[in-house]
């Protein structure tokens, strides 16, 4: 089996995390998974949604979008269509759920963190790149809250990262790019914390069901890849 990129089955694409990518947001990152590039920002807003007011806890929510020419052919902006696509809603809910597992909302106080993930170039794995980059932006936003004296306890509980795995030409592979994703027998997205806890698994067989052994092999690959991503996140935060 030869991957289109020439990578071995256990290899991530080249990963690059650039912090402070924009100047206004409390946390901002450009994350690159090969040719997939996503800008992730974390914005702090005083106050919480009405269903949480007066409870002394914070909130975290996420939005996701793709630039019209982030793909091979131009897409209309969702604002021009007048509604979000189901895929967009699904992905931004996934990002929000995943990153809420990273934070102690009680320690956040009555503050809201908005995560915005905007895909500027797509080559597969946009949701996994968004989650991985958004955590770094979140960490910077939390550091800002602490520096401003708006929180006293540590809100961050764990690091969160995500990667795709799949069965391509009968072989479990890590971090699928678009040519692999579009031809894969099985595609799975895994979100995990740096404590080894599993936060979410999304897996789909395209034609034939995958076996329990294949599932275990994919999960093992994902755990390995996410471990590498956690190291890259910490390296980015150290600079």
UniProtKB/Swiss-Prot annotation:
Molecular functions (GO terms): 3'-5'-RNA exonuclease activity; tRNA binding; tRNA nucleotidyltransferase activity
Q: Which residues bind phosphate?
A: 87, 125-127
Q: What Pfam family is a match, any one?
A: RNase_PH
Electron transport as a keyword?
no
Gene3D superfamilies found in the cross-reference section: GHMP Kinase, N-terminal domain
Query: Per the similarity annotation, which family is this?
Result: Belongs to the RNase PH family.
* NCBIfam families linked: RNasePH (TIGR01966)
Identify this protein by name. Answer: Ribonuclease PH
Provide the organism lineage as a comma list: Bacteria, Pseudomonadati, Pseudomonadota, Gammaproteobacteria, Cellvibrionales
């Amino acid at each position: 089996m030869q991957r289109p990129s020439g990578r071995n089955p256990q290899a991530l694409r080249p990963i690059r995390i650039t912090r402070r990518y924009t100047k206004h947001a409390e946390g901002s990152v450009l994350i690159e998974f090969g040719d997939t590039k996503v800008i992730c920002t974390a914005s702090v807003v005083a106050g919480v949604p009405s269903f949480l007011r007066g409870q002394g806890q914070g909130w975290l929510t996420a939005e996701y979008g793709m630039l019209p020419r982030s793909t091979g052919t131009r897409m209309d902006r969702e604002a021009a269509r007048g509604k979000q696509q189901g895929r967009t809603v699904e992905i931004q809910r996934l990002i929000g759920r995943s990153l809420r597992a990273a934070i102690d909302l009680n320690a956040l106080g009555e503050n809201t963190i908005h995560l915005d993930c905007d895909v500027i170039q797509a080559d597969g794995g946009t949701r996994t790149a968004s989650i991985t980059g958004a955590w770094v932006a979140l960490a910077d936003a939390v550091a800002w809250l602490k520096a401003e004296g708006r929180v006293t306890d540590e809100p961050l509980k764990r690091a969160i990262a995500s990667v795709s795995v799949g069965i391509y030409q009968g072989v479990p592979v890590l971090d699928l790019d678009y040519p692999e994703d579009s031809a894969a027998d099985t595609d799975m997205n895994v979100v995990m914390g740096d404590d080894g806890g599993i936060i979410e698994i999304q897996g789909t067989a395209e034609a034939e069901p995958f076996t329990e052994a294949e599932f275990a092999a994919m999960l093992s690959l994902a755990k390995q890849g996410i471990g590498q991503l956690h190291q890259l996140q910490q390296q980015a935060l150290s600079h």
